[in-house]
A protein has these predicted regions:
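Bacterial N-terminal signal peptides that target proteins for export
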Residues: 1-9
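Bacterial N-terminal signal peptides
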Residues: 10-19
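Bacterial Sec signal peptide processing site at the extreme N-terminus
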Residues: 20-38
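Structured C-terminal helix/loop/strand segments within mature extracytoplasmic catalytic/sensor domains
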Residues: 58, 291-415
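Active-site-adjacent helix/loop patches that line small-molecule binding or acyl-intermediate pockets
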Residues: 67-85, 89-91, 144-272
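A short, well-structured edge-of-sheet supersecondary motif
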Residues: 87-123, 344-345
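Active-site SXXK
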Residues: 118, 131-154, 285, 353
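Active-site-proximal alpha-helical segments within enzyme catalytic domains
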Residues: 138-144, 248, 276-295, 347-358
Length: 415
């Protein structure tokens, strides 16, 4: 089913999740949730498929309730180990160029895994809310790819990594002055840096009778599987201090990348970054991309499998800004970070991980989140580039196991 309006999205979410939705807490200075054991929520009965889980208790509203994960569950054990290993890590510091982000308790720390079958594993501050910031960018560009096409995203915005910081004006100037293949070079960079994300908002088609903000928020809600809202404190704080982004959007207008009202595009982008989410939300949103664009909790086909694949390709290229190559080299999965402390990592066809920990490294990525995801995926085998040698083909076409020790050719080469 393809969703066409925000109102349809909200109706779907209410019907699917019912009144049994969990309560959600907003992260604030000095607040936080005490460390908790891993809990698991089974997928909705009608979406469970072939996932083998003990029967889940269900709330009166129809939403499966969390329960302790069964002993020996490999995902639960890996999640608990990753959480404990980095719980006391004190590296990094909160973003301070957006004043309100500097006040968030740096000890908040949550990890969540959501499988494509809809099982949810969570530990720590998994439901504390924070501003989504740049983690919103892949989901908006997924909607643009779905409605305007992948080609226009490549042409108007670009899909290559910039090698510069996420808000770099230098990167815009360098891209604008590349002498060759000008039809393919755009100063916006890609949809996951600020210039490209603002251009993405400008490019987003709006169905008749809807406003653009309704499309943006409704799309994020469809990915998350629940109603979301803007944190007004964050929105005001960003709006009062976003002078750098104002310069960026004026350049985008001068370069004819932004074709509408530049200040409107910037305001919509700022609102988008100010939406409140939790690590659990990010994991559900990532699992929707991992599941070919189908939300594993609501069953809604939010975007097509093709749009989800294109989106993940962009995330793999530029999700962690100038450190994306290093991340892909070490971890091997697409991931997107935000200066609010969130990270979403996606293993296509399997699961997604959502994390929340406010202290950041110099590139703007959560320090604890990166370390925890890397440790978790090492145990769960999520690296997309990892493989084992295949056996030799027999004349029948069957594969025989690879022999122990070096092959004869390798052995000869050692002599």
């Amino acid at each position: 089913m393809k969703v066409t309006s925000r109102h349809a999205l909200v109706g779907l979410i209410v019907i699917s999740l019912g009144s049994g939705c969990a309560t959600w807490r907003r992260a604030r200075a000095g607040g936080g949730t005490a460390a908790s054991p891993v809990s698991i929520t089974a997928p909705p009965p009608d979406l469970a498929g072939n996932l083998v889980l003990a029967a889940a208790t269900v709330t009166p509203g129809g939403a499966p309730a969390p329960r302790p994960a069964p002993a020996g569950d490999p995902i639960a054990e890996a999640l608990a180990d990753a959480y404990r290993s980095f719980k006391d890590l004190s590296e990094g510091k909160n973003a301070d160029y957006i004043p309100i982000l500097a006040s968030i308790d740096p000890k908040l720390y949550g990890l969540v895994v959501v499988t494509v079958q809809g099982a949810i594993y969570e530990i720590g501050s998994a439901r504390d809310e924070f501003s989504i910031q740049s983690v919103s960018k892949p989901f908006t560009v997924a909607r643009v790819i779905e409605t305007a096409g992948a080609e226009i995203v490549d042409k108007r915005i670009g899909v290559n990594a910039t090698g510069q910081k996420f808000n770099s004006i230098l990167a815009m100037d360098l891209l604008k002055n590349i002498p060759s293949d000008k039809d393919k070079v755009t100063p916006a960079g890609n949809p996951l840096v600020n210039p490209g994300a603002i251009a993405t908002v400008d490019l987003l088609p709006v169905p008749t009778g809807m406003d653009k903000w309704g499309v943006i928020l409704g799309n994020l809600e469809a990915f998350a599987g629940r109603k979301l809202s803007v944190n007004d404190e964050v929105y005001r704080s960003e709006s009062e201090t976003n002078t750098h982004n104002r310069a960026i959007v004026q350049l985008l207008k001068d370069y004819e990348v932004v074709q509408g009202d530049p200040m409107q595009a910037l305001d919509l982008y700022t609102r988008q970054c100010s939406v409140s989410v939790s690590a659990r939300d990010l994991a559900v949103m990532g699992a929707t991309l991992a599941n070919g664009g189908r939300n594993p909790l609501t069953g809604a086909q939010v975007v097509s499998p093709e749009s989800a694949a294109k989106t993940l390709a962009i995330v793999a290229t530029a999700g962690l800004y100038e450190t994306t190559g290093e991340w892909l080299y070490k971890v091997g999965v697409p991931a997107k970070s935000g200066v609010g402390g969130g990270i979403v990592a996606v293993v296509p066809g399997k699961f997604a991980v959502g994390t929340f920990s406010p202290p950041l490294d110099a590139a703007g990525n959560s320090v604890r989140g990166q370390r925890a995801v890397e440790a978790l995926l090492q145990k769960l085998g999520g690296n997309l580039f990892a493989s084992k040698p295949a056996g030799r083909a027999r004349s029948t076409g069957a594969m025989s196991p690879a022999p122990d020790g070096p092959s004869p050719a390798v052995a000869r080469g050692r002599n």
